[in-house]
Structure formats: structure tokens, C-alpha cells
Swiss-Prot record:
Protein name: Protein SPO16 homolog
Chain's gene name: SPO16
Assembly and oligomerization: Homooligomer. Interacts with SHOC1, SYCP1 and SYCE3.
InterPro entries (alphabetical): SCRE
Organism: Bos taurus (Bovine)
Lineage: Eukaryota, Metazoa, Chordata, Craniata, Vertebrata
Compartment annotation: Chromosome
Signal peptide: none
Length: 181
């Protein structure tokens, strides 16, 4: 635990289900190194990472592999994935997101327009891990509760302390005295 601005930061860890096809990949090792409980499964879609407590799932695909395979093959894989997972993200790896990669993303977006799929273009493993962990963290129940509490506290502070709010209340009170209704 590290201290910052007088507050303790608690290290966030969760259980992650990873496709067995990713066992030898850098992504799996990086998630294990972050002290997450990693479980491998043959029953999930190849290339998928599921943060079960957060309810989010990520499908990892390399842009080069998409270019080399038939379009219907990888589109069918994506469709199967989004039909299974309600909160789904496609993590599209490319060292450089040039015109071809952007066209690929556009085709995928067109195909799945109106679905629950979101596309995350990433350049490397560190980028992918940071995005996945951030999304999973902010969608976990404990963080949602914490964010809601902070928003309620901030709202209460603004109402109690804001000179603008006080002025608006005075205006409202003075306008009520003139209103015959």
C-alpha cells in the first residue's frame, strides 16, 4: 500500500477467467503479476478475458490476424462473443493504427451497430492491461458504491457551501413572497 495525499490506496484485485488459448501470452502473465486471481478455462471463447465480479468481458484480437483470415470468420467469432456477454469489449491490437486498421474497426462497428460491443484500439500489452483493469475496476460494485457516495457527498457540500446556490435560494425565497399562489 502506498500513501498519497494522506489517503491510503488499496490495491484492487479480482478474479479473472482467461481463455486457455491465452495461457502462454504476455497478457495472462501481466494479469497474474498484478496479483489478480487468474483462472484458465477451455469453455470460454478463444482469446477472451472475463472479469466476472465486474460483469465485463474482453475479446482480444490482433488486427494482422483479422486481415489474414476471412472477414466472416472473425465477425462470426465477435458475434458469438457479444451474444454470450452483455457487457463486451473488443480489444484490437495493432502496433500502428493506420488507414487499414481504422477501416477494419469501421467495418466491425457497421456490422455490430446497435449492439453492446465497444471497440478498444490498443498498441501493446501494457496499454491493453491498463484499459481492461480500469474498466473492470470502475464497473465493480464496490467502486460504483464508492463513486455514488462521493457524488452524494459532493452534492451535499455544494448545496451547503456554494455562494451561488445560496444566492439562488435567496432569489427563490424572495420570489415566493411576491407570488400570490
Amino acid at each position: 500500500m502506498a500513501e498519497s495525499d494522506g489517503k491510503e490506496k488499496i490495491k484492487w484485485t479480482t478474479t479473472i477467467i482467461i481463455s486457455s488459448s491465452l495461457k502462454s501470452y504476455e497478457v495472462a502473465a501481466a494479469l497474474e503479476n498484478r496479483s489478480h486471481k487468474v483462472r484458465y478455462s477451455d469453455s470460454v471463447e478463444n482469446g477472451s478475458i472475463i472479469f466476472s465480479l465486474s460483469g465485463v468481458a474482453f475479446l482480444l484480437m490482433d488486427a494482422r490476424e483479422c486481415f489474414m483470415s476471412a472477414e466472416e470468420t472473425f465477425l462470426a467469432k465477435i458475434e458469438k462473443f457479444i451474444n454470450i456477454h452483455q457487457n463486451s469489449f473488443l480489444v484490437l491490437f495493432a502496433a500502428l493504427h493506420g488507414p487499414e486498421e481504422w477501416k477494419l474497426m469501421f467495418r466491425i462497428q457497421q456490422r455490430f451497430l446497435g449492439s453492446n460491443l465497444r471497440i478498444l484500439p490498443v498498441h501493446n500489452t501494457v496499454n491493453a492491461i491498463n484499459l481492461m483493469c480500469t474498466i473492470a475496476k470502475i464497473t465493480s460494485k464496490s467502486y460504483i458504491d464508492s463513486i455514488c457516495y462521493r457524488m452524494i457527498t459532493t452534492k451535499a457540500y455544494i448545496i451547503e457551501q456554494s455562494p451561488v446556490w445560496k444566492t439562488l435560494q435567496k432569489i427563490k425565497l424572495s420570489s415566493d413572497t411576491f407570488n400570490p399562489n
